[in-house]
Amino acid sequence: MVREEIAVSTRTLQWKCVESRADSKRLYYGRFMLSPLMKGQADTIGIAMRRALLGEIEGTCITRAKLDKVPHEYSTIVGIEESIHEIFMNLKEIVLRSNLYGTRNASICVRGPRYVTAQDIISPPSVEIVDTTQHIASLTEPIDLCIELQIQRDRGYRMKTPNKYQNGSYPIDAVSMPVRNANHSIHSYGNGNEKQEILFLEIWTNGSLTPKEALHEASRNLIDLFIPFLHAEEEGIRLEDNPNRFNIPFFTFHDGLANTNIRKKKKGIALKCIFIDQSELPPRTYNYLKRSNINTLLDLLSNSQEDFLKIEHFRIEDVKQILDILQKHFTIDC
């Protein structure tokens, strides 16, 4: 194993790109470092950056395709090697680069016999095809293939909605994720109280963005998320002004037991034998309850809203989730 030597700043927080390469038109790699950081800071930044890289960056992709005289998505056409479904899967993989907003139209209109590739897509000037060699279909006979396409910019993964097939137009599962993968690692150095950390970020993209561009965009998105906290006090924003605010009522085991619905529905069942892992609580809420030694429905109903909010990192939203679960499964009218 070769040890890597990297010069780091001992005072000013700095970042640098330590490795960058293009493995192919649709696979870029970049490795970045940030230092010096105090103990714990590298993990905080690394986790936030990875989530922002994978989930907050927008991408452009084909979201709908239309072919005339095609009865359904799994049809086949004489003279085309692939089924319509396979053609749609190939269109889904086409990597596009664009800063467009809203929806744009594109098209393919070719005559066989020939191979159809991404180069045959007639797109608006604002849309660039990253890899024009990407395969779409193989025409084995002298037939015409015309496909109308819809291009959209979005983020994340959006599954096609069932029963949205209109006039030969079919939705395509949209994968608007320019970052294919992201990892972070931490290197500690120094001794005792002087111990510091270096954060390493590895980013793989699909070619529509370079890793450096992805890092910048993810950073901007994170900053935008935190800006409201910086200006909340200046603008005099108060919790009472929030129209979406909700009040969580207090509840106890005795109040719940007095409710006739729960007594009828759960008659003869010892509440202490019903464990909270049977209640479909979200993992975050479940973990905090377990850490607080709340294991059964009896434990759950023996606590009030105030008791739950005393649990470290527990939020009003978590209490509301508990109420929703109780109302759903035990018919408690809170």
From Swiss-Prot:
Entry EC no(s): 2.7.7.6
GO molecular function: DNA binding; DNA-directed RNA polymerase activity; protein dimerization activity
Keyword tags: Chloroplast, DNA-directed RNA polymerase, Nucleotidyltransferase, Plastid, Transcription, Transferase
Pfam families for the chain: RNA_pol_A_bac, RNA_pol_A_CTD, RNA_pol_L
GO biological process: DNA-templated transcription
Region (Alpha C-terminal domain (alpha-CTD)): 268-334
Domain topic, free-text comment: The N-terminal domain is essential for RNAP assembly and basal transcription, whereas the C-terminal domain is involved in interaction with transcriptional regulators and with upstream promoter elements.
Role, per record: DNA-dependent RNA polymerase catalyzes the transcription of DNA into RNA using the four ribonucleoside triphosphates as substrates.
Family: Belongs to the RNA polymerase alpha chain family.
Designated name of the protein: DNA-directed RNA polymerase subunit alpha
Species whose genome carries this gene: Chloranthus spicatus (Chulantree)
